[in-house]
């Protein structure tokens, strides 16, 4: 836990001279990683599930807004399922998190992002599975006619690949471990649609229950990206590893040491604080997506013969 910018975020986005030396020393391993990742995707068995599958993905590791994007576009359709890996969940294998808004498992079983999707998508079913093809098959079994695949670019499915491109890219366009990319940046050319923040969509933020002295507590990737949306009432920032659980005793200690009047958390973090008795302020995030992006997704869905405008 640190209150300043985490080491890895500095390493990937604003490296020191020493870190730059380490980056180039590790570059041969990045080339190996890139080759394996590309070869694995290109040679994977092709799956065609005969329904529209929209993959919301990115090329960089960590957060880039995939969950907010799904939360914004999935409610536009009926008979929908969302399939995700369920990062940092306590469970293994395939788990049905919700069926048309009826939540069946706990946040720890689902993972924070999948649980957030289940809480907000009342018309959709949410499924987590390390093997995405099994998740899609379960979605079909539950009656889904449209599937949104969270972080699915690397899978060789017959799908519409939408890639989110960050407004502020990593410092070097290298693959892990010298950079933050999971595949070559040339892979953007293989997507059906690439969307960039402030060009194709805007982030709209608001704070529920704001107070005079808020202590920011978050466990998301690249947490300093929140800085642009934070009010002056934030007295301190506590950053935890992406998806990490919160120690409530530690939060309470920090809360009183900083004379805070509430904890400021994101919606993703909020689902892990159901047992927290401290006052909570919530940083809400919505996306305003360019109509042309939505039209392209509609066009893809309508290309399947049994989908009609009534389903949109």
Swiss-Prot record:
Pfam families: LpxK. One of its GO terms (biological process) is lipopolysaccharide core region biosynthetic process. Keywords: ATP-binding, Kinase, Lipid A biosynthesis, Lipid biosynthesis, Lipid metabolism, Nucleotide-binding, Transferase. Disulfide bonds: none annotated. It catalyses: a lipid A disaccharide + ATP = a lipid IVA + ADP + H(+). Transmembrane segments: none annotated. Signal peptide: none annotated. It comes from the Bacteria. The keyword Transport does not apply. One of its GO terms (cellular component) is plasma membrane. Coiled coil: none annotated. ATP binds at residues 60-67. One of its GO terms (molecular function) is ATP binding. Pathway: Glycolipid biosynthesis; lipid IV(A) biosynthesis; lipid IV(A) from (3R)-3-hydroxytetradecanoyl-[acyl-carrier-protein] and UDP-N-acetyl-alpha-D-glucosamine: step 6/6. Its EC number is 2.7.1.130. HAMAP family: LpxK. Transfers the gamma-phosphate of ATP to the 4'-position of a tetraacyldisaccharide 1-phosphate intermediate (termed DS-1-P) to form tetraacyldisaccharide 1,4'-bis-phosphate (lipid IVA). This is Tetraacyldisaccharide 4'-kinase. The gene is lpxK.
